[in-house]
């Protein structure tokens, strides 16, 4: 019997990659587990399913007969969450709880996608899964609450924290830099926030590997290597062949230019320790993943 998979936020950066990888049976990294052969995927966005409506979620999951639920639905605008924490809490915390209860009721597995922003980012050492959390923003607080609710309500739950995600669809930092780089001679980017740029293709690959096991709990899943946003921007300009200089600034300078911006962790690099210890860490070095992305992007945008 082929597996039935529900992906919420199904047409977002991650949802899109999950759909394609499941169709093709492989990612840019390589083949996915045989358990997914012939899998049926239901990609639900807000039009199909309001994840904040507990009753609707329970009914949708029960009727769908799903084996696996991947929650890619989130309010990810970090600055926007700061001024709308109630709305962010509904989507980032209550909705995962709804999905977790629904998955538990039908015996399905749940993957709750989370973020490096659950950490304070005060220590310049990559975080492992059981390091103490301490979010400094509304986005981080609401996502941490979503992790807690998911793990509490579903016994077959994986929490997968990622960071600085970019995919072939939708808006992301890489596409923004390419757009600005084509128009401008220079762009100003912060140089004192460090983390891991992550390809949605790599993340989707590892999520499918993890979810084929019963090693439940928290995982970190980012591309390998730590850089600043300015380093990331420079790599994009170089890789896309754009003649645009990256001017480096501090978070303080950025905040002065953008007063509504949320506080962000200074150092939120993650170490994929649990992956290393279980299914194996196949996440590519971030520059390799970015090169592949830039090569594939014209064809993907077709």
Question: Model-found features: residue ranges?
Answer:
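C-terminal amphipathic/interface module of NAD(P)-dependent oxidoreductases
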Residues: 263-302
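Rossmann-fold cofactor-recognition segment
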Residues: 40-55
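Glycine-rich Rossmann NAD(P)(H)-binding loop
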Residues: 189-194, 219-226, 278
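Mid/C-terminal beta-alpha module of Rossmann-like enzyme folds, strongest
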Residues: 206, 213-260, 294, 301-302
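N-terminal Rossmann NAD(P)H-binding glycine-rich loop of SDR-like oxidoreductase domains
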Residues: 3-28
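NAD(P)-dependent short-chain dehydrogenase/reductase
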Residues: 148-195, 200-202, 208
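Catalytic helix-loop patch of NAD(P)-dependent Rossmann-fold dehydrogenases
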Residues: 90, 94-98, 109, 118-160, ...
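NAD(P)H-binding glycine-rich loop region in Rossmannoid oxidoreductase-like domains
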Residues: 51-91, 102
């Amino acid at each position: 019997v082929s597996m039935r998979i529900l992906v919420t936020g199904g047409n977002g950066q991650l949802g899109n990659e999950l759909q394609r990888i499941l169709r093709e049976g492989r990612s840019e990294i390589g083949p996915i587990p045989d358990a997914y052969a012939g899998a049926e995927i239901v990609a639900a966005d807000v039009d199909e399913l309001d994840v904040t409506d507990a009753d609707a979620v329970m009914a949708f999951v029960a009727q769908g007969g799903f084996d696996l639920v991947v929650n890619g639905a989130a309010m990810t605008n970090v600055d926007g969450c700061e001024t709308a924490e109630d709305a962010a809490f509904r989507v980032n915390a209550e909705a995962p709880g709804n999905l977790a209860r629904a998955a538990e009721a039908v015996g399905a597995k749940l993957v709750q996608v989370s973020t490096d922003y659950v950490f304070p980012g005060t220590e310049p050492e990559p975080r492992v899964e059981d390091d103490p959390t301490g979010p400094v923003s509304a986005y981080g607080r609401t996502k941490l609450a979503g992790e807690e609710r998911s793990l509490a309500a579903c016994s077959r739950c994986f929490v997968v924290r990622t960071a600085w995600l970019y995919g072939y669809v939708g808006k992301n930092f890489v596409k923004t830099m390419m757009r600005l780089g084509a128009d401008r001679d220079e762009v100003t980017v912060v140089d004192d926030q460090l983390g891991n740029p992550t390809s949605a293709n790599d993340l989707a690959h590892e999520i499918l590997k993890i979810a084929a096991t019963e090693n439940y709990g928290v995982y970190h899943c980012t591309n390998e290597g730590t850089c600043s946003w300015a380093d990331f921007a420079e790599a994009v300009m170089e890789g896309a062949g754009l003649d645009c200089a990256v001017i480096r600034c501090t978070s303080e300078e950025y905040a002065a230019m953008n007063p509504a911006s949320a506080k962000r962790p200074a150092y939120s690099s993650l170490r994929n320790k649990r992956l290393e210890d279980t299914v194996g860490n196949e996440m590519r070095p971030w520059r390799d993943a970015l090169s592949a992305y830039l090569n594939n992007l014209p064809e993907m945008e077709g």
